[in-house]
């Protein structure tokens, strides 16, 4: 069996729930593991492999919303976790940040996987703004910690759910939308490397794009008719549940499948390159499927987003924004402790405060180099946790 072995590890209550929803969707070619400190809650996880961690420390009663307990529990059970991950080529670690087990244990699980040489991807959620402030503080700390121990990290702010669902949508239905990002990431990558195609992509291509690349953007789009490729690729790069764009990405995988033409492939690749910039390394895959009459599906995985910070594109980890500032000042470290004002700065062309339309260059941005960056209108909002500093 030459197929890459992919494992999804759901850590804590939210992680276990995400695994359950993926199992319900019957995603093939993936192994699932449920990890929790709460013995009773763990029994509700449908994963074939269940790991109760920190049994001596927590007595099976959970982490009590204390990340330090979750961390110690994972460290206590490190041998069991490593044994469960043995033989994997790629591991997705998913959790809801802000509580005890997910926030504390997920970075430990990720570190164990990465130390074993496994390509490790984190997919985590941030709490709703209406939740306790302490929970958000825990979440942001947890995101910083897991980021140190994964090759690639995808952050899903739960507040984004409020923008895409109506008022009558139930809580379970809304949270299922967040889990769809994880599902798309896993399904998209398994299809890339396990399904034969006209232009084939393999696990080595995935490693090239995702190994040690930091913050990532992933999306899947569908289209029909004459403009199906453009319709699908726009949907994929916008990913409404993420706060990232592909602007300034260093590496991008584009995989297009369906009833596709050469023109469709060219349209999709050209659009992505226009957004990401001339220096982006694009790896392209294509799978022709005549059964999908006049329709196509496009998967876009963009990584290395923070590497372009010096070119004026600052990725929004944990709800940050793409601040319009001189590129010489835009480094990840310089953002820490900055006193950021909530009013939009005036550009050199006197257009301060005017939000650009989506998928358009930001007018008047300071350009030491040729920058083809675009940000969505919503990305100009200054996050609450930075305003409070």
What is the role of each PLM region?
Residues 1-389:
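Tubulin/FtsZ superfamily GTPase core signature
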């Amino acid at each position: 069996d030459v197929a890459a072995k992919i494992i999804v590890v759901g850590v804590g209550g939210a992680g276990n729930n995400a695994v359950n929803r993926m199992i319900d969707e019957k995603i093939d070619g993936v192994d699932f593991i449920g990890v929790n400190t709460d013995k009773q809650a763990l029994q509700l996880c449908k994963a074939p492999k269940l790991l109760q961690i920190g049994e001596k420390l927590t007595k099976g009663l959970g982490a009590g919303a204390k990340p330090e307990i979750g961390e110690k529990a994972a460290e206590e059970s490190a041998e069991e976790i490593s044994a469960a991950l043995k033989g994997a080529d790629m591991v997705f670690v998913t959790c809801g940040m802000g509580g005890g087990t997910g926030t504390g244990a997920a970075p430990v699980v990720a570190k164990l996987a990465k130390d074993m040489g496994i390509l490790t991807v984190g997919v985590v959620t941030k709490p709703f703004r209406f939740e306790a402030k302490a929970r958000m503080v825990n979440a942001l700390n947890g995101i910083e910690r897991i980021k140190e121990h994964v090759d690639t990290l995808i952050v899903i702010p739960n507040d984004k759910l409020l923008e895409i669902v109506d008022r009558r949508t139930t809580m379970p239905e809304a949270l299922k939308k967040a889990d769809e990002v994880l599902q798309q990431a896993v399904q998209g990558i398994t299809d890339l490397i396990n399904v034969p195609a006209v232009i084939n992509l393999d696990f080595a291509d995935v490693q090239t794009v995702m190994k040690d690349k930091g913050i990532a953007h992933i999306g899947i789009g569908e289209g029909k008719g004459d403009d199906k490729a453009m319709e699908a690729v726009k949907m994929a790069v916008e990913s409404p549940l993420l706060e990232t764009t592909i602007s300034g990405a260093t590496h991008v995988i584009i995989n297009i499948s369906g009833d596709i033409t050469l023109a469709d492939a060219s349209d999709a690749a050209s659009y992505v390159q226009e957004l990401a910039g001339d220096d982006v390394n694009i790896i392209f895959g294509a799978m022709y499927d005549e059964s999908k009459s006049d329709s196509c599906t496009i998967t876009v995985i963009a990584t290395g987003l923070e590497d372009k910070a010096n070119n004026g594109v600052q990725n929004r980890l944990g709800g940050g924004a793409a601040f319009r500032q001189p590129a010489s000042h835009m480094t990840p470290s310089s953002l820490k402790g900055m006193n950021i004002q909530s009013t939009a700065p005036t550009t050199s062309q006197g257009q301060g405060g005017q939000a650009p339309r989506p998928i358009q260059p930001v007018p008047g941005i300071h350009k030491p180099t040729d920058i083809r960056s675009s940000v969505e209108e919503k990305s100009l909002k200054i996050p609450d946790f930075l305003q409070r500093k």
